[in-house]
Amino acid sequence: MVTLQEVKQYLRIDFEEEDPLLLSLLATAKQQVMSVGRMDEAQLSEHEDTARTAILYAVSYLYEN
């Protein structure tokens, strides 16, 4: 759904040192969105545009804080 490259572009990161951290934050953000939205993988895919925005927002929040 959301790739590491999309996260890096969203956060304006162009170096690779934080890739492991970003991948971890991406997984956490996806789980948060699924939990808060009470969705499974299939439902997340049905609402892909909204879920993508929510996941990117969550990754950004986790990265900055």
Where are these regions (language model features)?
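Divalent metal-cofactor coordination and adjacent catalytic microenvironments
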Residues: M1-N65
